[in-house]
Amino acid sequence: MGNLRFYNTLTRKKEDFIPIDSSKVRLYVCGPTVYDYAHIGNARPVIVFDILFRLLRHVYGKDHVIYARNVTDVDDKINARAIREYPKLTLNDAIHQLTERTYDQFQQDTEALGCLLPTYQPRATDHLEEMRSLIERLLEKGHAYIAENHVLFSVNSIKNNPLYGVFAKRSLNEMKAGARVDVAPYKRDDMDFVLWKPSTQQEPGWKSPAGISVLGRPGWHIECSAMSMAKLLTPYGGGLACDDLSVNVFDIHGGGIDLIFPHHENEIAQSCSVFGTERMANFWMHNGFLQVEGRKMSKSFGNFITIRSILESNFVEFSNAMTDDLKQSWAGLSARFSMLQTHYREPLNWTAQRLAQSSSELYRWYELLRCERSCLDNGGVIDASLISTLSDDLNTPNSFTLLRKFYKEENAVALVQGMDLFGLLRQEWVREIECPLFVKGIDLDSKFIDQRIAERLLFIQNKEWAAADEIRNELAKKGIALKDEKDSQTGERITTWEVK
């Protein structure tokens, strides 16, 4: 087995990853709320944890990793959007239309981004019984209470638990000041949060737990506790019925850094209180924030970008022979390529230039593979240095340095295996001779770049420095960085280039 080390948000340090059971490595990631098109901020955790899923499958075997990513299909934002978009339908029918349409679109978008399907994609509305069971257990143990047909989690019931608040690195007073809590007279404490709430006659509702007579719907946090239990604990060891506490803990929980508080803090409180464990998951991994052109992404700033808009944009000049499906697949892999050049825990600045440059570099990689089509038939052994680098807390920037090295060395076999590991390979684009070229234009022609470098070297020999600098600047604007050095054998000046 490979030596995997990941940064654990729970301990704030990198640790060796040792699964509870290497024959069933278990990963849970918070997924979409299906009320609107997914944006590029949503795309980042989808891509990041797809890379983790691929690495775990490589190390432990494809059949020995369980990846669950939930779908939230009950939410007040869903209700409001459904009423607005389907005013002529009943609310339940409108919600069904909206959530099905949005879910299908999310599936198409993530496929275009090169992501594998998770093992499970549980929907909240399919796991209401598990939610009710968890809530009733919390009531029995004194960690929850009923008030005005709501069920609320009592934070004071576990305030002596050393884990509560440690995850978010906040004191109770800090969390009270910073949390977006509903001001409600029925709460015993401002920090208490909703496990279940009543529905009006106009809102969707289901049978409530603990004999509450009115219909209701779950709170946000209980959904993930229930769905992770259903898919990672119950089939594995019996979930609630199992006395072995270690079985009621899974290996990795992932999500965006914005979910640390209150969502993940409250998930931990719920699950640990039900199962009597000190941990919900042994590792917590979080991806960093995403900005657009140096600013927070916001509709008010005019920089709100959906995955769909990227897939349908002409950010490079495409070949006329390309179909719309092929263009969208190319755009999706270019976006994936672009995101993976930043370490998952670091902030990511999304720019149009960065996307175009990623497309340019990816295109050249495919040029090499298409010239060496036999690379597809040379076994499936991935370069050990690539696995070692990725195993160090998913270090994709250093991994891409190795992929660029393979490209420069024209090592098509190592490059194709690396691209496959990172979800960047479409074998049919390499194998099919008649597959149309993906992009066109002199900007992406390596022969043109080599020609301009030769012209620049001639200008340097003639001491025409301004003309030489003009070529360097011209290529820099296209994302091409030049590096001047001396040949170790002849001492002559040589110039190499790479995409930045």
Curated annotation (Swiss-Prot):
Motif 'HIGH' region location, chain numbering: 32-42
Cofactor (UniProt): Zn(2+)
Cellular compartments annotated: Cytoplasm
GO biological process, one term: cysteinyl-tRNA aminoacylation
Motif extent ('KMSKS' region): 296-300
Catalysed transformations (reactions): tRNA(Cys) + L-cysteine + ATP = L-cysteinyl-tRNA(Cys) + AMP + diphosphate
Keywords (A to Z) from UniProt: Aminoacyl-tRNA synthetase, ATP-binding, Cytoplasm, Ligase, Metal-binding, Nucleotide-binding, Protein biosynthesis, Zinc
Residues the entry annotates as binding ATP: 299
Binding site for Zn(2+): 30, 224, 263, 267
Pfam annotation, one family: CysS_C
InterPro entries found in the cross-reference section: Cys-tRNA-ligase, Cys-tRNA/MSH_ligase, CysS_C, Rossmann-like_a/b/a_fold, tRNA-synt_1_cat_dom, tRNAsynth_Ia_anticodon-bd
Cofactor info, note text: Binds 1 zinc ion per subunit.
Gene Ontology CC, one term: cytosol
GO molecular function terms listed in the Swiss-Prot or TrEMBL record: ATP binding; cysteine-tRNA ligase activity; zinc ion binding
UniProt enzyme class: ligase
EC number: 6.1.1.16
Description of how the protein assembles with itself and partners: Monomer.
Family affiliation: Belongs to the class-I aminoacyl-tRNA synthetase family.
Protein name (Swiss-Prot/TrEMBL): Cysteine--tRNA ligase
Originating species: Bartonella bacilliformis (strain ATCC 35685 / KC583 / Herrer 020/F12,63)
